[in-house]
Amino acid sequence: LRHAGVLALSRIGEVAPIVALAKSENRSLRIAAVLVLRRLQSEQLALFLQDQDEYIVTEAARAINDDWSIEPALPALASLLKEEKYTSEPLLRRSINAALRVGGEKELDLLINFAKRESVSSNLRGEALAAIGTWASPSVLDRVDGRYRGEINRDAIVVKHKIEKFIPDFLKDKNPDILVAAAKAISSLKIEGYNAQLAQIMKNHASPDVRSAMLAALGDLNYTKIEEAMKIGMADIDRGVRTVAVGLVTQLDLSKEKLPAIVEPIFKSGSIVEQQKMLSVLGEMPLEKSKDVLISLIKQGNDKKLSNGVILDLTEAVEATKSEELISQLGTLKAHGDGLAAYTETLNGGDRRAGYQYFNTNSAGQCVRCHALGGAGGAVGPALDNIGNILSREQLLEALINPSARLSPGYGMVTVTLKDGQTVTGILEEETEDELILKTSDAEPMEIALSRIDKRQNMASGMPPMGTIMSKREIRDVIEFLANLKKN
């Protein structure tokens, strides 16, 4: 009913009577007014940012920031950062985003003061610091809803001048969220006066996320003692910190004689992620330094002495060198064709988070148009909430590369020719070791013993073979994501 009323009032298009509802004592009318003004894209929504009800203020913030945005009202939304009474995270994230988008000195001051306020939750203070760090060149995508906002370039000198004097206070903070955000801001703004403090925090802080952030910042800031910091990072107990340290190898002026001493321990006892990072680094290094190490790794790969989770990374690193000599040595490591054997290097070693991102957002794969997770998504194909308990990694790969090879019960048509000559077509409801159960035009499902079947034909799946759409790296990431979708 409310939707019908909102739609009708927005089509009538009279703004003044709707704005007048800002003074109404009826909460429902004020909420409806926000919804109508959102449809009308009216900057008068800024009036509702002064409402006494934080829910209504938050709805007004959503209306102003999200979708196409109401840009004239963004300064008013940003100004809410000075109000200490608000606690709603959706509201304050939009206020932070509005300040970043408006981009004036006033908004920058609001962000800095908000980040300093200890009464604010650490994740929101960290978000404010992150916005400050990207002030000179924000992402083209909205920090809240991901919509494309276009390229913005500002003078970094202004933000560096304003934030630099507060850096010592942020680095003294005990909260990991603040320290990580501060390190990233220092790095992106190229503030170089605090390298010694970053190094000290990197050595001593209990949080691996903080140690990783400090080490990464030191690498970006060309720290003079980066080799020492890298060695400390490589000896860290946390895999993530060690992986960051591996990425710093390219910043060292290493001779080819010293390189094996760094690489070999990683492939002897390091994690898959560390090995993948090392291979990425080797692919970027001058060939005269990395050649001998790559030759050794290729041999290990051909001798089955490397984890399958790094074979794709090895082939990519070798191809990045553009050395025909090395590429020719890959042999069977570089699989070709369109069968499953050509994709075996995608079975392990994927990035689960990247797979999640691909599944939910990639416009080429369009996974969520057909498959649901947690009740959200399409119903053309089966829900995948428990797919990791149902299919092996090999079966997941087959489902991506050759989706018609195996039908999911309830989602595919099968035609079988029986040994007595009868032909039956129906939807596959269940398949066991002994029989097929098909839903046909008959009232009851038909149970057909496999021993009676002379020929079976699965109808082509509506899902295209994803090997023609996805890169091998994307396939590997999606397999890692799907293999971990398991219900207890």
Where are these regions (language model features)?
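Residue-level detector of extended alpha-helical repeat arrays and alpha-solenoid scaffolds
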Residues: 2, 30, 57-58, 88-92, ...
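The canonical Cys-X-X-Cys-His
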Residues: 355-358, 362-374, 384, 463, ...
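Structured surface patches comprising rigid loops and adjacent beta-strands/short helices at the edges
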Residues: 443-462
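Core register positions within helices of long alpha-helical scaffolds
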Residues: 4-11, 35-39, 63-66, 94-101, ...
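Amphipathic alpha-helical scaffolding segments comprising HEAT/armadillo-like alpha-solenoid repeats
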Residues: 1, 11-23, 40-50, 69-83, ...
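Electrostatic cytochrome c docking/interface patches
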Residues: 334-362, 392-395, 419-421
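C-terminal capping alpha-helices of c-type cytochrome domains
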Residues: 314-321, 401, 422-424, 428-434, ...
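Short inter-helical turns and helix N-cap capping residues of alpha-solenoid HEAT/ARM repeat scaffolds
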Residues: 25-27, 52-55, 84-88, 119-121, ...
